[in-house]
Amino acid sequence: MQNSRPGIQKGARAQRRFAWCASHLAFGLALSLTLLGCTSGPPAPDQGSYVEELEAARAARDKAYRESEDPIPAAKRDTLLPLRYYPPDQNYAVPAQLSLFESRQEVEVPTSTGTLRRMELVGTLNFTVGGQRVSLGALVPAGTRQIEELFVPFADLTTGKDTYKAGRYLDIPPTATGLYTIDFNQAYNPTCAYNESYECPYPPPSNRLKVEIRAGEKAPGA
């Protein structure tokens, strides 16, 4: 699984382990906030606790990046840390329905280094955000048997302006019901946003939203 994670540094096993661990340390807390499941499940947390826990998760990510050798080079840490985010906004935590394909579609996803990464499209997440009905493709690494996480790279109308020019990522645990909460407050930059030695997949054309997602992480230094 480590080799399949977004944001892998070429030729360095230790860096691959970091790419796997850093994103989970950073957003493991945040992912638990929205319960990412059936809309008939437990009620959403109140705004106060939601903001506190989201900000704690963001602070944990800053700490991990400041104390680790990668992905942010030491010379850039004072400039790039703390990471920049939009203010938390629960209007960007929206219910979604996953429509699974009868069989997975193998795709070759372009990356920041000019290579292609083999992945599988398992279905589409359909939802409404910003008053528009939209969808995002959900991917897994090629050859994945048991899905532990849906990888959702996306771009939107803030991309290249307030947010990173190559798009952002969401990691979403699967549910048994096909009902989800997509929380764009948890959207984060690929590691190549901070270090060009990493190889990061780009969002496919179908995952380029024609709506502003003013939530989640901003471009480095924005």
Please report, for each region that a protein language model flagged, where it lies by residue.
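C-terminal partner/receptor-binding element of secreted or periplasmic proteins
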Residues: Y194-A222
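Bacterial signal peptide processing site
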Residues: T39-G41
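Acidic, glycine-rich flexible loop segments
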Residues: V152-Y188
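Mid-length scaffold segments of soluble, non-membrane domains
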Residues: E102-K165
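C-terminal motif of bacterial Sec signal peptides marking the signal peptidase cleavage site
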Residues: L35-G37
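N-terminal secretory signal peptides
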Residues: Y50-T124
